[in-house]
Amino acid sequence: MHKYRTHNCNELQLSNVGQEVKLSGWVHRRRDHGNLVFIDLRDHYGITQIVFTDQNQQLMYDASRLCYESVITVSGTVVARSLDTINNKLPTGYVEVLAMECIVESASSPLPFVINNEKEAPEESRLKHRFLDLRREKLHNNIILRSQVIAHIRHLMIARGFTELQTPILTSSSPEGARDFLVPSRIHPGKFYALPQAPQQFKQLLMVAGFDRYFQIAPCFRDEDARADRSPGEFYQLDLEMSFVTQEDIFNTIEPVLYDLFTKFTNKTVSNTPFVRIPYNESMLKYGSDKPDLRNPIIISDVTEVFRDSNFTIFRENIKKGSVVHAIPAPQAASLPRSFFDKMIEFAISKGARGLGYIQFSESGEAKGPLSKFLTGQQLEILKATANTSNGDAVFFVSDKKDEAVKLCGKVRIKLGEELNLLEKDCFKFCWITDFPFYELNEETGKIDFSHNPFSMPQGGIDALEQAKTTEELLALTAYQYDIVCNGIELSSGAIRNHKPEIMYKAFSIAGYSAEEVEQRFGAMIKAFRFGAPPHGGIAPGIDRIVMLLAEATNIREIIAFPLNQQAEDLLMNAPSYVEEKALKELSIMLSPSSRKIHKKNTNL
């Protein structure tokens, strides 16, 4: 018989009754019934009940003193449970093991929090003792799910003709939109490597090198603040790139992968392929966001023309100054009490609005509310049709400059969806957002900058770039850039790449980069493109966010084995940490006087 186990704790069935077995695991629960002691023994696979009887008084006494989470090895005989003690919640619930021997392999110290229930402990304590936290069933299962998802992704990608390749972790800095994590070079004083924010240039170089379809489960590093759906520091993505493809080819490749993943690992309804395609401008108007949650049926409308000649002076004057009026319908909300409308107004004001107008249409069709008296009967009918409202509905209004109105309407739409319980249950609603602006105005400098990925191909190519002369014309340019969104969460951005040096130089020059700067930052890629670069494109769905959705986790740290906290600290390994002065000197690093003082104090030098 094996030294530690003949079976795992999820295996034993009625067919094993009468067999002598050996199990090892952790003491999950202990129940003392006087002449019987029950231990729920847990391992990676499941739980088996162990019974200690008074036929062996010493063994039963020892079992009664076992600490939770101690590791033990039990030898015994499999017996059937009586009908009244069968536990249908466990795969092993029809049997138990009558213990004949129990060896304590490793006794546990007192626990900082309870392991055997799902009551949440303080997150700081959980992260400091992550090895204990990972024993909890829900979190343990999340990590197993993550492993299964990644394994299935590999299977799906290889089956579609993709080659898995690894790209460097130590590379050069590039403008990906976030701060880099820098690594000083000992051999080259004063120079730094950067951890990759994404394998962007390398995967494009692989296409130039003739690898037709590439993928990897890529670690990416960005010095960003934490959010509920974004871990600071490190994250993983399904990075892929394809040669000789159009935008639709990318869509047709990744849609079946996502559909397969979400149908395999959940029982929820998943959007049928092809997924809905929504141009960026349409998404911003209808949903007030480029990450729309399509479970919410509310669609925003532009009703500026309805109010242009209305008797409502505030909106009419706003329109004359260039503002717009957008309507957000509230289905079947007309009969709700005044407190509901006051609550929505307070919410809008808290988000920066000056107010929130509304009209209620009763079941009989009568218009009520603060703004109803300012519209004629004909204007009200046009409003109902434009805003897609019916009798029994209410409709809210926002008037502001277009960009501000769009953002606020999006927030009001989400709030209404929650307040009115409108979100469709048990489903994953996917959509593509397409035709993103190629450029945007930098909020800090007021100058033209890339809206998203600077390596995207502008729609219309070099001709479009050369013909756009004014700022308005430049901001109207669109890119072959796309996002995949699920339930209001952006899973990935992607693009058809700019593979022509002359277009790249022109695109960067408009954004204020000289040819020398482009050569310095992207010299390897520019050089490669001069030796025959295929048209290519790609996408990189975030694995962390996919697993988060599949696990129904509310925080991304719940699907990562060893995450950083919101302050980008690893409380278990005490990272980041101070290093000795000798190590800094070897890297030619000198701290500022204030940092040096703190450093000396913490390194006891």
From Swiss-Prot:
GO terms for biological process: aspartyl-tRNA aminoacylation. It is found in: Cytoplasm. The record marks 33 as: Important for tRNA non-discrimination. Residues 200-203 are annotated as: Aspartate. It holds the Pfam family GAD. Gene3D superfamilies: Bira Bifunctional Protein, Domain 2 (3.30.930.10), GAD-like domain (3.30.1360.30), Nucleic acid-binding proteins (2.40.50.140). It catalyses: tRNA(Asx) + L-aspartate + ATP = L-aspartyl-tRNA(Asx) + AMP + diphosphate. PROSITE patterns: AA_TRNA_LIGASE_II. Signal peptide: none annotated. InterPro entries: Aa-tRNA-synt_II (IPR004364), aa-tRNA-synth_II (IPR006195), aa-tRNA-synth_II/BPL/LPL (IPR045864), Asp-tRNA-ligase_1 (IPR004524), Asp-tRNA-ligase_1_N (IPR047089), Asp/Asn-tRNA-synth_IIb (IPR002312), AspRS_core (IPR047090), GAD-like_sf (IPR004115). Its EC number is 6.1.1.23. Keywords: Aminoacyl-tRNA synthetase, ATP-binding, Cytoplasm, Ligase, Nucleotide-binding, Protein biosynthesis. L-aspartate binds at residues 176, 222, 452, 497. ATP binds at residues 222-224, 490, 542-545. GO terms for cellular component: cytoplasm. It comes from the Bacteria. One of its GO terms (molecular function) is ATP binding. Belongs to the class-II aminoacyl-tRNA synthetase family. Type 1 subfamily. NCBIfam families: aspS_bact (TIGR00459), PRK00476.1 (NF001750). Homodimer. Aspartyl-tRNA synthetase with relaxed tRNA specificity since it is able to aspartylate not only its cognate tRNA(Asp) but also tRNA(Asn). Reaction proceeds in two steps: L-aspartate is first activated by ATP to form Asp-AMP and then transferred to the acceptor end of tRNA(Asp/Asn). This is Aspartate--tRNA(Asp/Asn) ligase. It comes from Rickettsia prowazekii (strain Madrid E).
